[in-house]
Every structure is written in structure tokens, then in C-alpha cells.
Amino acid sequence: MLILTRKIGESLLIGDDVEITVLSIRGSQVKLGVKAPKEISVHREEIYQRIKVLADENPSE
């Protein structure tokens, strides 16, 4: 795992198309902004896990 330190307003790039920017920090909570092409899905981990479970329950698609 790569560990990075960023300040508010600073970004990191994933490949050529995905940019993640630190928007704010309040206590132990960090607000991130994500710029990515529309064809790349961006989900919080807990939402992605639910999507996977639903897909496993309904494999018709």
C-alpha cells in the first residue's frame, strides 16, 4: 500500500485520468473530490460491496 501525505487543495493522480483532491479536513474526517471519466465508476467501499452482493444474488445481468 502506498501511503501519501497531502494538504488541503493538494491532489494525487491515478493513471492519466483520475485525480483525487483533498477538499477539507475536519477532525478525523477528510473530504475528497474525485475527477474521473464517466466510464470509470467511483464508489465508497461500503456501497461497492453492496453492489457486488446484489450482482452475486442476481447473476442474470
Curated annotation (Swiss-Prot):
GO molecular function, one term: mRNA 5'-UTR binding
Keyword tags: Activator, Cytoplasm, Repressor, RNA-binding, Translation regulation
Cited Pfam families: CsrA
GO biological process, one term: mRNA catabolic process
One Gene Ontology cellular component annotation held by this UniProt entry: cytosol
InterPro entries: CsrA, CsrA_sf
Main location: cytoplasm
The keyword Transmembrane helix belongs to this UniProt entry's keyword annotation: no
Superkingdom, natural source: Bacteria
Compartments (UniProt record): Cytoplasm
Gene3D superfamilies: Translational regulator CsrA
Cystine pairs: none
Keyword Cytoplasm belongs to the record: yes
Assembly and oligomerization: Homodimer; the beta-strands of each monomer intercalate to form a hydrophobic core, while the alpha-helices form wings that extend away from the core.
Entry's family note: Belongs to the CsrA/RsmA family.
Function comment: A key translational regulator that binds mRNA to regulate translation initiation and/or mRNA stability. Mediates global changes in gene expression, shifting from rapid growth to stress survival by linking envelope stress, the stringent response and the catabolite repression systems. Usually binds in the 5'-UTR; binding at or near the Shine-Dalgarno sequence prevents ribosome-binding, repressing translation, binding elsewhere in the 5'-UTR can activate translation and/or stabilize the mRNA. Its function is antagonized by small RNA(s).
Name of the molecule in the record: Translational regulator CsrA
Provenance organism: Glaesserella parasuis serovar 5 (strain SH0165) (Haemophilus parasuis)
Gene: csrA
